[in-house]
Amino acid sequence: MALALEAARSWAASVLPPELAAAAGGDPLAALAATAAALVAGVVILAVWFRSGGGAPPKAAAPPPRPPPVKIEADADADDGRKRVTVFFGTQTGTAEGFAKAMAEEARARYEKAVFKVVDLDDYAAEDEEYEEKLRKETIVLLFLATYGDGEPTDNAARFYKWFTEGKEKEVWLKDLKYAVFGLGNRQYEHFNKVAKVVDELLEEQGGKRLVPVGLGDDDQCIEDDFTAWKEQVWPELDQLLRDEDDTTGASTPYTAAIPEYRIVFIDKSDVSFQDKSWSLANGSGVIDIHHPVRSNVAVRKELHKPASDRSCIHLEFDISGTGLVYETGDHVGVYSENAIETVEQAEKLLDLSPDTFFSVHADAEDGSPRKGGGSLAPPFPSPCTLRTALLRYADLLNSPKKAALVALAAHASDLAEAERLRFLASPAGKDEYSQWVVASQRSLLEVMAAFPSAKPPLGVFFAAVAPRLQPRYYSISSSPKMAPSRIHVTCALVYGPTPTGRIHQGVCSTWMKNAIPSEYSEECSWAPIYVRQSNFKLPADPTTPIIMIGPGTGLAPFRGFLQERLALKQSGVELGNSVLFFGCRNRNMDYIYEDELQNFIQEGALSELIVAFSREGPAKEYVQHKMTEKATEIWNIVSQGGYIYVCGDAKGMARDVHRALHTIVQEQGSLDSSKTESYVKSLQMDGRYLRDVW
């Protein structure tokens, strides 16, 4: 009954005109009308509720929800004299969104007379034409922008970034705008924080006034410290813009962020009105994306390495028939996998809770009002569910905890010494020790919790502030819809090895794939929510254009899709251009994956030349960049005649070495000086003829 009334209140509030809600504090007759309307709404919703079975959830549960479009208060855009700040975020894993919300929450405490609104860039404008109209009205903006992949924007920032960087010349049209940009990236990658840097520069070029230098958050170290340092630069600038001379709000009292916490409602599992949320093939939405994935069964799983190998590489096929999911050759698939059961059991012991604990998760208070610290809450995962389900599918348990998680653990540690130690590790004074003991040692969240056994956060805190949401893992699709229209193929190397603490780290998704049960062996097969992320890693529109593909190890994945595509075109009578594949592995008797298929592509004419580097066969290690040097003349002939170059694989090592080799080939074969060589290679990238799918 309580849940039904809560649903009635929520529904009534959403349909009543704003005047009625406001009338409760004004005209008694209007207040009576509002009350009557709410009661009628409640009766209607209660009738529907009980007729439908007492609130039992539908058979097909909703997938992980997308954050709703930004709700702006009725007076947020009114000209009431208050100064306004818009805080944008472009996020892939939720970190940028978390920083944006934390910044806004602290800013509201510091500047009570100002209005702050946090906006998902994807929700800012329904159509591209609206971007300019809306931006012209902004006066102060803060942007939190993550760089993803090979210098690309995140999914939710891609449309804005494309419009802002590729649109018509706008000249000086943002002269009334003041802005600050914080980037999130990893210094190990070539295009470190490219998106933030580009947006920061373009905003200035188009008339905006930069408040502070662009923040360069580095996830390879402690990105939270980078955010804190940048934030401390921003406050004095905002003080000048938002604080009156007589305004001392927040100036003397240090701000302490509230620890985010979901509202948890424990449910008697015997209540048949509630069922554990389950998945169906369709996701109930017309959209399939990171927030609306679809369930896909594992159809095929097989080991690609030979028995002599001490490593593992898995070929997996997802069955997408009946899901509405489509893909193109070269796209990526995002996979929401499960934690290993051993990992989950350890978490259950540390939380001291039964795996059958049944509960629902809510981001608001019982009366529907925002929770304390709720401004930084992510939308809750689907519930009700058991603790076992929540830990399996939604909790990131193996990454190193952020400092905010240590603060939350400290708040719920019964041992004072443990609480003090946790707070120290999260403090500026403990920066070096946190860097060594947590980050460099690759201590997982569960390892840290085991080291502080008195820290027992309630479930609402654990899922909101301690364990981040388990993120999808991305894989280059290794098939073509021309050959496999109802399947998505994945080629995945098993992540397995010791950490500095001696723990054997097993990759969450690769381990799940290694142990997956395919439908060809059992009706009780493994499955995962998946979605397709579009990529610009595509074959030339003209199939006669020559191509060079460079992909050692699992970097072969998208090129297997390319070659399937070319084979299908060949079989349909289409003329193909020259194609060369540089592949690398350790030993032909261990890890030469898809060897038979590659030979068949050559025999059928889909592949012109296959060049393989074996790094562990001869006296000297040989890699793909060495083979490129041997084929320098051939590579230059293809490139100089309009050919395309594709690279897939490790960004930190292989892709850098290949880039250097290409630079040398262009310089020597083209007889160019260093400056002209750099310009030539950059023009290949700008023209879309030098494409990289790297991680």
From Swiss-Prot:
The record's free-text note on cofactor binding: Binds 1 FAD per monomer.
Ligand binding (FAD): R473, Y474, Y475, S476, T491, C492, A493, G507, V508, C509, S510, W695
Topological region Cytoplasmic: 51-695
EC number in record: 1.6.2.4
Entry GO MF terms: flavin adenine dinucleotide binding; FMN binding; NADP binding; NADPH-hemoprotein reductase activity
Gene3D superfamilies listed in its UniProt record: 3.40.50.360, NADPH-cytochrome p450 Reductase, Chain A, domain 3, Nucleotide-binding domain of ferredoxin-NADP reductase (FNR) module, Translation factors
First-level EC class: oxidoreductase
PROSITE patterns per UniProt: FAD_FR, FLAVODOXIN_LIKE
Name of a matching Pfam family: Flavodoxin_1
Cofactors named for this entry: FAD; FMN
Protein's UniProt keywords contain DNA repair: no
Annotated residues for binding of NADP(+): R311, T554, S615, R616, K621, E622, Y623, V624, Q625, D657
Domain FAD-binding FR-type: 291-540
Record-listed FMN binding positions: 91-96, 146-149, 184-193, 219
GO cellular component: cytosol; endoplasmic reticulum membrane
Subcellular location: Endoplasmic reticulum membrane
Flavodoxin-like domain boundaries: 85-235
InterPro entries, A to Z: CysJ-like_FAD-binding (IPR003097), FAD-bd_FR_type (IPR017927), Flavdoxin-like (IPR001094), Flavodoxin/NO_synth (IPR008254), Flavoprot_Pyr_Nucl_cyt_Rdtase (IPR001709), Flavoprotein-like_sf (IPR029039), FNR_nucleotide-bd (IPR039261), NADPH_Cyt_P450_Rdtase_alpha (IPR023173)
Biological role: This enzyme is required for electron transfer from NADP to cytochrome P450 in microsomes. It can also provide electron transfer to heme oxygenase and cytochrome B5. Can reduce cytochrome c in vitro.
Family, per entry: Belongs to the NADPH--cytochrome P450 reductase family.
Protein name: NADPH--cytochrome P450 reductase 1
Species per Swiss-Prot/TrEMBL record: Oryza sativa subsp. japonica
